[in-house]
Amino acid sequence: MSKLFFCCLILAGSFCSFRSLPIIVPSKGSLRLSESALDFGDLKSWDDETRLLRNLPMFVDKEAERDAEDIFSKEGFGLDAYNMDDKEELFDKHPRISLLSRLQSKDRKQFKKRAGNLSECFWKYCV
């Protein structure tokens, strides 16, 4: 009975995903763009490569002048602005977070293999 339920659930999920796809009706016309939308003019007149090569040193010089410390200090993200002690004090005082930190697994003892009888152990749990 549960297998039938899961099969129905999988089928319903696949039909919902198919239902979200757009339906294409051929009578409404084609989905292609018109020729005027694809007209970019004479591409040879753009001459992008020479314009890019001509302006590339200007872009590189501007980026080289900007130092990482300048970027962080302008936006208020200085390296000295982050103080870990303040964050820890704030989080330790909150009752929910301090309760969760006590329940975390980092305080649990690590598993140690016994050198004695292996029949007392199953996988990593020893009796």
From Swiss-Prot:
Disulfide bonds join 121-126. GO terms for biological process: blood vessel diameter maintenance; regulation of blood pressure. This is Urotensin-2. It comes from the Eukaryota. The lineage of its organism: Eukaryota, Metazoa, Chordata, Craniata, Vertebrata. Involved in smooth muscle stimulating and ion mobilizing activities. It has a suggested role as a corticotropin-releasing factor. Keywords: Cleavage on pair of basic residues, Disulfide bond, Hormone, Secreted, Signal. Residues 17-111 form a propeptide. The keyword NAD does not apply. It comes from Pelophylax ridibundus (Marsh frog). Belongs to the urotensin-2 family.
